[in-house]
Structure formats: C-alpha cells, structure tokens
C-alpha cells in the first residue's frame, strides 16, 4: 500500500469523525434549542422557574404518580405528579414507569363508571374524569412536552352562565378544595376542562387565585403535550346544599355538611378581593331589641329585564317603602357590575326578588336580614328551595319568606318563545292545552320539563295586598337576632375520670354508683345549661336504660341486680342539644 493511499484513508477517517462529531454537536445544539424553546413555552404559562431538562428526566424516569382520597368516584379527589394532557386526543395521559404510583389501584374498576367527578355535581355522566395509560418509554416518539410548573386544580365548571351554579357548584367547592389540599391556594392555577368559553361571570373565578385560569381550548396553544408537574383533580362536595333533580325531584341534599359560618367566611373573602366593605348598617347588633333601628336601613329589590318580570315593579317598590318606612333600592345584573350589587346587598335589611339565580347573592346579606322570594303562578315554593335552604343553614341567620302568585289572571305567559325560555308551540296541541290548564306544576326531574319551563318563565303582576299580608305575617315570625356567642355552638368534650362502685344489699337488691369529672373544655366556657346522659346496659342484653342527670354522680338501684355485670356510658350535653362524645365504657360488676 502506498503512502498516498494510506494518507487518503486516514484523511477520510478524520473527516468522517469530524462530520460525525459535528452532527452530534448539531443534534445536541438542536436538542438544547428545543429544550430552551419548551422552557420558554412553559414559562409563558407561569412566572415560576422550571429546569426543563430536570422535569423531562423526572417524567421519563419516574413517570406519573397518583394518590387519591375517598372511597368512591363521587367523593374522590386525586393528587397527580406529572400527569399529562394530549390536546390532539383531548385525553389525559398517565405515563407508567417502574417508579409510578397509582393509589387506589382500581384496574378496570376505574371505568365503573369513572375515577372521579370533575365537578361538585354528584355522579353526573357528563362530569366523569379518567385518563389513558402509556409506558413512559413512548415519550421518545411523542412531541416534546410543555411543563406547567404551577400547582393546578383541574375541574369542570357545571354551568358558568348561571350565577347560582357559579357559586354553588364551582366557586364555593373550589375555594374550600384549595383550602384543604393546596399549600398556597392563592398561587394555584385553575384549569377548567368542561370546554365552555369564559362566560359572563369569569371575573368571579379570577378572584380565587392570583393566576389567570386556563380554559380547555387554551391548552392546545401551548403544545400538543402538556404535563402538570403537580395537580389536584376533582372538587370537594362538602359545601353544596342542593341537588338539581337528576335522579329524584330537586331539593335540599340529604346530608348537608356545610353551615352558614363557612358560607359567610367565603363571602367575606370574596368581598375583600372585590375591595368591598360592608355597607353602613350592614352588621346590625340587635341585642335583645329590634325597635332601635340602625341609621340607614333599606330594602333591595332585584329587577329583571328580559324574563320572569315583575310587571308592576314600581308599584311594588312604593308599597314596600310605605309599609316599612324604608328606602328601597333596585339592582340589576343586566345593568350593574357584580361588585356594585354586592356592595348594596351587603348592607340591606331585606332582599326581594323573583325566583332566579340572582338570589344566590343573598349569601352576602348581613345577619338578621330578610329574604323574600316571589314565585310565578302554578309554581309551588315548597318544591324549588335552593335559596330557602341557604337561608336556613345554621349560622346564616337569614329570615326567609316565600310569596306565590295564586291568581291566574295576574300572569303573562309566553307560549311562542323558544322551548328553553318556556315556549310550548313546538308541542302537540293536546299537550299545550294540558299545560295551559294546569294550576300546579307536578314534581319532575331536571331539566327540560315543558310545563315547568312554561310556568317559571311567566311574567307576574304582583297582587300587592296579598304580598304585603304575607310579608307582615313573615316579619312577625322573624326571630330576634341576638349577638351569637361562639360558646353557644361548641360541643362538650368527653367527661373525665368516669368510675363506678357497686354494693349488694340483699340477695335481690344492689346499687350502682357512677361518678365522673366535667369535660376539660367546660372550665373555659360559659354554658347556660349542663347535663349528663348515662346509659346502663346489662351485659348480654340488647337494650339499655338512659338517664339525664344534672349532677356528676348518681346511685342507681332500680332494676340493678346482684352479681351482674353492667356496661355504663357517660356523656355531657350543653344546652339540651349539643352532645359530647361518650367516655370509654365502664364495666361494673355488682
């Protein structure tokens, strides 16, 4: 082999090596450039810094991780690390690696019917959440992910066009879910996955966080694959008090877990975020007398401009002013900003409104205020009670009065409107006549009952004498609002040091003495009435004997037998109905 050939071969090898190295450097540079681009995209979403390479490595090596609370899909909320969303498929993706965690690991039960509810409306088949599964290795064949470094709460808004649904289904549940699960709730980002546009009340959702909420449609703008570094999915249902009639006719929930205290705390926070201070006279400390009026008591009337009108609104306003000798103010969702309406309502003594979503603003009323709800002809106030239920929650301290139009000649119907506004022209003539002749809408399921829609969208000429009569009777029945003491709602702790002593008197007589010390927290409370409940059960029997006692010891002799073992439980009761827990059971042998 000649020297020239050898040098040529060597030169080719060197050039090939250089080209290979250059291609690798170019590939690495392209990768770095892509990572930089993806980092920029991630940072477009958030001010939080993210190390893209570290985040990508974590996803590839550890995959997605999930830990949930709750036993059923209806009460489950899940925390995810590195859950991803593919905007192309419109699906969430769980990437599996050897380090992935999935608790609960339900297998196919995850589809019976879903992992969880995305909204606070229980078990609604349009609100189910689930995800697809892929091995983490498939990330190599997918578009580079954009990472969302914020802690996110992912949910569905149920009906963002309706103010009642906005508060009851979305804002309250999201507010307390964030309190429960998120470390810094004001810095969390809300992600709405139901697919709706912003809607008329989007500013209210913005109040929950310092960060702009994201809509489902916006996610595709940030890339084909988005990965949430830390997210919570689902909403707590503990703050909801009403069910809308999907399974049974609408009404209060069977097991209400929220009180007025939580509602009022939420309202206070929202007012602060809207820069609203409660109007003068709003917090009325009435003490034991109601005749001493604050400087500026006034009544608020909600005015509607399109449907469900009060046809003689001006006459109604004059009658209220004369009857109660108060100023009457009108507010309108169509004409005023929401904060300005809340400012007015927060100081009102009475809120008067036709049935409708605007009555959810009653949660901003001061304690002691009156809520007056008007119902159109043939609509039974006892069957549609979201605002009555709200007003009656313990701690809301609102007095609720319903009025119903009972005169058919005082109603104006709209049979030719679209069906969703109560029109019935699309129905068979026989069904139209049946609806027109009906005097009372029968109980029904949600959501398209034509008779209900026909009647609820009527306009009403309010019969002033009957309206004032109902109001007078209702106001008479209004309880005095006393300044509530926190101690009046607190429960006793367990009685301390319970003991029993026994003695046998004769072959068929015995005595059982039970004693105990007061609950530890009682020494710090001023309680009007303290009593104790004692249960005595003969061992082996199913029944027990209950006793209510004012003192801390008592000797029982009736029905106490010698040489018998008795089980004894003791608990404290404040003010007749605030029950404490039972102390550990005593086993007492005579």
From Swiss-Prot:
Source superkingdom: Eukaryota
Enzyme Commission identifier(s): 2.4.1.312
Enzyme class name: transferase
Keywords from the named record: Endoplasmic reticulum, Glycoprotein, Glycosyltransferase, Membrane, Signal-anchor, Transferase, Transmembrane, Transmembrane helix
Fibronectin type-III domain boundaries: 494-590
InterPro entries found in the cross-reference section: FN3_dom, FN3_sf, Glyco_transf_61_cat, Glycosyltransferase_61, Ig-like_fold
General function of this protein: O-linked mannose beta-1,4-N-acetylglucosaminyltransferase that transfers UDP-N-acetyl-D-glucosamine to the 4-position of the mannose to generate N-acetyl-D-glucosamine-beta-1,4-O-D-mannosylprotein. Involved in the biosynthesis of the phosphorylated O-mannosyl trisaccharide (N-acetylgalactosamine-beta-3-N-acetylglucosamine-beta-4-(phosphate-6-)mannose), a carbohydrate structure present in alpha-dystroglycan (DAG1), which is required for binding laminin G-like domain-containing extracellular proteins with high affinity.
MF-aspect GO terms: acetylglucosaminyltransferase activity; protein O-acetylglucosaminyltransferase activity
Entries under Pfam families matching the protein: Glyco_transf_61 (PF04577)
Full protein name: Protein O-linked-mannose beta-1,4-N-acetylglucosaminyltransferase 2
Localization per Swiss-Prot or TrEMBL: Endoplasmic reticulum membrane
Pathway info: Protein modification; protein glycosylation
Reaction equation(s) it catalyzes: 3-O-(alpha-D-mannosyl)-L-threonyl-[protein] + UDP-N-acetyl-alpha-D-glucosamine = 3-O-(N-acetyl-beta-D-glucosaminyl-(1->4)-alpha-D-mannosyl)-L-threonyl-[protein] + UDP + H(+)
Family of this protein: Belongs to the glycosyltransferase 61 family.
Residues in compartment: Cytoplasmic: 1-4
